């Protein structure tokens, strides 16, 4: 089997394994009494991670350079990063719920790379002179790892918002998610049926008395789940943000060496800055401003869209120095 055939086998295998693993995690969430499913899910993600690593290694041997120079390679590197961050988050949190939201994204990335990209974008090609630099591995790999971590953290925030929908959740204790939650019931004021009373002059008057109606509260199990999701989200974003910062700085140094300017407001650079600002605002709100509960989760959830626009949306528009030029 030559390297090209091996790569085709590995990319299809990684997609199939992630698809089956996604079904296992969903089944485990629907039927938590089945003890075998969580272990199968973790094993599936580990196998997919190894398959993608082997694919990237084969690509490296075939092309002779670190395989992150085109969209196909970067998508698989991103999928590898998502599965790696998943394994770290799952191990540290001891929660099998991580895979419920991360495996669909990892599977979707591999499906897009394997099934949707044109054939010419899946083949390796010699590097252009501008990319023949050690900064390629330093800058791009760190940026892709930061995207993976920030995506996983944002997914945990989205899951937190779903679990706590319709409720006002606040975190007691430190901002790192180690305290317990308290639930503030949302009370709505309504008017009871009128009570008619006779007045002194023989007439009648209607008395309207307000009543308080409390919304349904979360169960203790859901409160514990919300705490776990918030904790994972905060810690994973705390991992991805320094990587994003390092990646942006490395890119600026590389740009100065290649084009004589640290920053040129290329669309990719602009959206990288927007991504940095969104997650900087999230961490600032959590650490300094004391935001807790749903408000910072909404900010983190919006970062999921921002990361995808920065990584894929700008690249596919065919504009700027970072374009893959597929749509235009």
From Swiss-Prot:
Write down the Pfam families for this protein, in alphabetical order: Cytochrom_C_asm
Q: How does it assemble?
A: May interact with ccs1.
Q: Which domain of life is it from?
A: Bacteria
Q: Which residues form a coiled coil?
A: none
State the name under which the record lists this protein: Cytochrome c biogenesis protein CcsA
Family per similarity comment = Belongs to the CcmF/CycK/Ccl1/NrfE/CcsA family.
Membrane topology note: Multi-pass membrane protein
Q: Which UniProt keywords apply?
A: Cytochrome c-type biogenesis, Membrane, Thylakoid, Transmembrane, Transmembrane helix
An example Gene Ontology cellular component term from the record? Answer: plasma membrane-derived thylakoid membrane
What does the record give as the function of this protein?
Required during biogenesis of c-type cytochromes (cytochrome c6 and cytochrome f) at the step of heme attachment.
A GO molecular function annotation here is: heme binding
The gene that this protein is the product of is ccsA
Q: Where are the transmembrane segments?
A: 15-35, 36-56, 68-88, 97-117, 142-162, 236-256, 263-283, 297-317
A GO biological process held by the record: cytochrome complex assembly
Give the location in the cell. Cellular thylakoid membrane
């Amino acid at each position: 089997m030559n390297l090209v055939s091996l790569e085709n086998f590995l990319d299809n295998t990684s997609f199939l394994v992630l698809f089956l693993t996604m079904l296992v995690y969903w089944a485990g969430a629907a039927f938590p009494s089945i003890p075998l499913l969580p272990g199968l899910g973790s094993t599936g993600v580990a196998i997919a991670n190894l398959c993608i690593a082997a694919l990237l290694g084969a690509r490296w041997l075939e092309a002779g350079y670190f395989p992150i120079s085109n969209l196909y390679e970067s998508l698989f590197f991103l999928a590898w990063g998502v599965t790696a961050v998943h394994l770290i988050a799952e191990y540290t949190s001891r929660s099998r719920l991580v895979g419920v939201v991360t495996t669909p994204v990892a599977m979707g990335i591999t499906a897009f790379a394997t099934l949707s990209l044109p054939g010419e974008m899946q083949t390796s090609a010699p590097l252009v002179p501008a990319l023949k630099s050690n900064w390629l591995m330093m800058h791009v790999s760190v940026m892709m790892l930061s995207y993976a971590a920030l995506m996983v953290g944002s997914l945990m925030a989205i899951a937190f918002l779903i679990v706590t929908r319709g409720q006002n959740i606040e975190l007691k204790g430190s901002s790192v998610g180690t305290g317990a939650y308290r639930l503030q019931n949302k009370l709505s004021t309504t008017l009871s049926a009128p009570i008619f009373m006779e007045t002194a002059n023989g007439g009648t008057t209607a008395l309207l008395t307000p009543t308080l109606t409390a919304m349904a509260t979360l169960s203790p199990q859901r409160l514990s789940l919300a705490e776990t999701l918030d904790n994972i989200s905060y810690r994973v974003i705390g991992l991805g943000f320094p990587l994003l910062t390092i990646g942006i700085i490395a890119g600026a140094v590389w740009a100065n060496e290649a084009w004589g300017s640290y920053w040129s407001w290329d669309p990719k650079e602009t959206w990288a800055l927007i991504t940095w600002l969104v997650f900087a605002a999230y961490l600032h709100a959590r650490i300094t401003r004391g935001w807790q509960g749903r408000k910072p989760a909404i900010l983190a959830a919006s970062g999921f869209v921002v990361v995808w626009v920065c990584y894929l949306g700008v690249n596919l528009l065919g504009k700027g120095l970072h374009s893959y030029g597929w749509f235009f």
